[in-house]
């Protein structure tokens, strides 16, 4: 059986909110991607990733929004529901980077985030991104805003990485975006990455009145597994998936 990548619907909502602000036909674009407007009702619901990516591509191309991913990513890191709640439970930035990588797998089943460490440097990275070129660009741009926002929890909201490596080769409306005003952006890389200063790693995050994160990983794993089975069962015809995988 082919693996069907799945993603939380909250990310479709982030791009859909941009369309709403512009007065663009969000519902029609969702339908063209094979999605119902109802997917936005439950941000923690999971949907086939290829449909989510298709919606993002249609939105960017139809509306001519070259920086759609950056606009969609213009949210507080606290705005991503359960992902945010659990990320903010850890005491310092070093643990936040590791938690981000773990929690991302409960947001997107093929998420590939990692922290690359040496004696002198620490890099926050995202491996190769799925989808067509336009899809990959705007998924990556939202992803990198979330990554930078995580470091800003400890470094302050004005912090920017000196160098940002992006996978996309399309620089339109990216280099001149305020998020990168003090960053050198390099395009066409194998991974998305930037260096996190060593002195920031032990910095404490703002305290939150929330329970401990450690006990929640097993429950998230169970919930995501159940949801995957439900989606897959609904997409099979005679035991064969009706969709393709990336």
Give the ranges of each region predicted by the language model.
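Short hinge/gating elements
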Residues: 81-86, 129-133, 213-215
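N-terminal low-complexity or simple alpha-helical regulatory segments
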Residues: 1-124
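Short, well-ordered alpha-helical segments
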Residues: 13, 94, 137-145, 222, ...
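Extended mid-to-C-terminal alpha-helical interaction segments
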Residues: 170-171, 175-246
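DNA-contacting interfaces and partner/effector-binding or oligomerization modules
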Residues: 110-202
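Short, contiguous, pocket-lining structural segments
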Residues: 7, 21, 135, 139, ...
């Amino acid at each position: 059986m082919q693996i069907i990548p799945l993603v939380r619907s909250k990310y479709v909502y982030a791009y859909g909110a941009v369309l709403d602000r512009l007065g663009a036909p969000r519902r029609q674009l969702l339908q063209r991607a094979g999605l119902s407007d109802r997917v936005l009702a439950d941000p923690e619901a999971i949907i086939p990733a290829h449909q989510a990516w298709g919606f993002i591509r249609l939105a960017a191309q139809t509306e001519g929004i070259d920086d759609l991913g950056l606009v969609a990513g213009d949210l507080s890191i606290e705005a991503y529901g359960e992902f945010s709640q659990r990320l903010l439970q850890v005491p310092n930035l070093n643990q936040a980077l590791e938690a981000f990588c773990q929690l991302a797998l409960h947001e997107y089943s093929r998420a590939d985030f990692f922290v690359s460490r040496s004696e002198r440097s620490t890099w926050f990275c995202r491996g190769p991104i799925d989808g067509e070129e336009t899809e990959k660009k705007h998924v990556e741009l939202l992803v990198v805003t979330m990554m930078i926002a995580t470091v800003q929890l400890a470094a302050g909201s004005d912090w920017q990485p000196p160098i940002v490596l992006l996978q996309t080769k399309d620089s339109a409306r990216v280099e001149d975006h305020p998020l990168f005003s003090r960053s050198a952006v390099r395009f066409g890389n194998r991974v998305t990455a930037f260096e996190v200063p060593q002195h920031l790693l032990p910095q404490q995050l703002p305290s939150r009145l929330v329970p401990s994160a450690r006990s929640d990983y097993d429950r998230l794993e169970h919930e995501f597994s159940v949801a995957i089975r439900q989606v897959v069962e609904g997409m099979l015809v005679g035991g064969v998936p009706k969709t393709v995988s990336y």
